[in-house]
Amino acid sequence: MTSQASAPKIPQLWVPLPSGIHPSWREIDQGSAAWLDRFGLYSDHAQRERLTRISVGEITGRGGPDGRLAALQWTADFLMWLFAFDDEYCDEGPAAASPDATLLIITKLQRIVEVPWAAPADDNYSAALLELRLRLDDLTTPVQTARWAASFRAYLQGQIWMAANSTYGRIPTLSDHLAVRLDSSGVKIFSTLSEIIHGYDLPAADYDRHDVRGFVEVFAAIIGWSNDLVSYHKERRRSQDSYGNVVDLIAHERQCSVEEAVSETATMHTRAMALYLRLRDQILRDAEPELRKWITDCDSWIRADYDWSLTTHRYVNPDDPADLPVGSAEAPFRAREADQPLPIASVSWWWTLLKD
């Protein structure tokens, strides 16, 4: 559970994927700050400062280093919305511990995603999401919009589960938490953004493949577990008390120290990364150009999130610095264990996708 005790040292994580960034990322970042001000997605000046120092332009530019500028700006604005909403409704605001309040706002937001031309938008977050949803139609195909909308709805629905756990003091099992957090973390949405940024449709025959669906889960887990480690210091100080972080859940379920739980989380990350690389190569063997491009874009998002997370002011607060690593590890954490499946019911099936 989160507390005010000093946060543990976070080890370097193994992310053996290429790094890049769009040359216009600073301009994109400035555009998102102006967009944030347009809708006033903050409660006070201090919160505005925290949000504008996140550098959404950087993570977007890293995730789509050769993407279309208008689509990158939309993506950065959407990520700004996610960060603001996460702080206000999911982690720190009064709705974070109220499933009723969470359900009310989510019902409204889902309607905006589905039928923006007929949905009410009577608060800042609804109005901002409506603007994003209408802009999206000018940038995408119906297929791209539908995939983004499905992943976004899954993210919203996951917030109800998180709020209910917090309200009733319910501590989920690690297995249940890992399954729900694939969606509630919002990370799966990243797997839909590349088609928007680059303007291509991944064929349904590829998108709905059993191994590709599993690949998306591994992709989301890698980013989600990395975020849980890097954000641990911030969450200890700013979030509602809850078991929303994998580190705290491991410490509770294993009855171990936070430092031991950090080490186990890093080991989980390494095993997922090793599996990701093997699945990646397996899928690429017979991949058509769109699937090949999409896989490469997933690589970019994993590396983008990791590089950005080590320098963003969201986690690296100069006034209250976290003990974070520098760069990616050259070798897997606990290398001898890297290829071993995780003995966790909700995710162990990923390893059954390997053909050799």
From Swiss-Prot:
InterPro entries: Isoprenoid_synthase_dom_sf (IPR008949), Terpene_cyclase-like_2 (IPR034686). It comes from Streptomyces pratensis (strain ATCC 33331 / IAF-45CD). One of its GO terms (biological process) is terpenoid biosynthetic process. Disulfide bonds: none annotated. Substrate binds at residues 181, 234, 314-315. This is (+)-(1(10)E,4E,6S,7R)-germacradien-6-ol synthase. Signal peptide: none annotated. Mg(2+) 2 binds at residue 91. Keywords: Lyase, Magnesium, Metal-binding. Catalyzes the conversion of (2E,6E)-farnesyl diphosphate (FPP) to yield the sesquiterpene (+)-(1(10)E,4E,6S,7R)-germacradien-6-ol via a putative 1,10-cyclization, which could require the abstraction of the pyrophosphate from FPP to yield the (E,E)-germacradienyl cation. The only accepted substrate is farnesyl diphosphate (FPP). It is an enzyme of class 4 (lyase). Mg(2+) 3 binds at residues 227, 231, 235. The Asp-Asp-Xaa-Xaa-Xaa-Asp (DDXXXD) motif is important for the catalytic activity, presumably through binding to Mg(2+). It holds the Pfam family Terpene_syn_C_2. It comes from the Bacteria. Its cofactor is Mg(2+). Coiled coil: none annotated. Binds 3 Mg(2+) ions per subunit. It catalyses: (2E,6E)-farnesyl diphosphate + H2O = (+)-(1(10)E,4E,6S,7R)-germacradien-6-ol + diphosphate. One of its GO terms (molecular function) is metal ion binding. Mg(2+) 1 binds at residues 86, 91. Belongs to the terpene synthase family. The keyword Lyase applies. The lineage of its organism: Bacteria, Bacillati, Actinomycetota, Actinomycetes, Kitasatosporales. A motif (DDXXXD motif) lies at residues 86-91. Pathway: Secondary metabolite biosynthesis; terpenoid biosynthesis. Its EC number is 4.2.3.166.
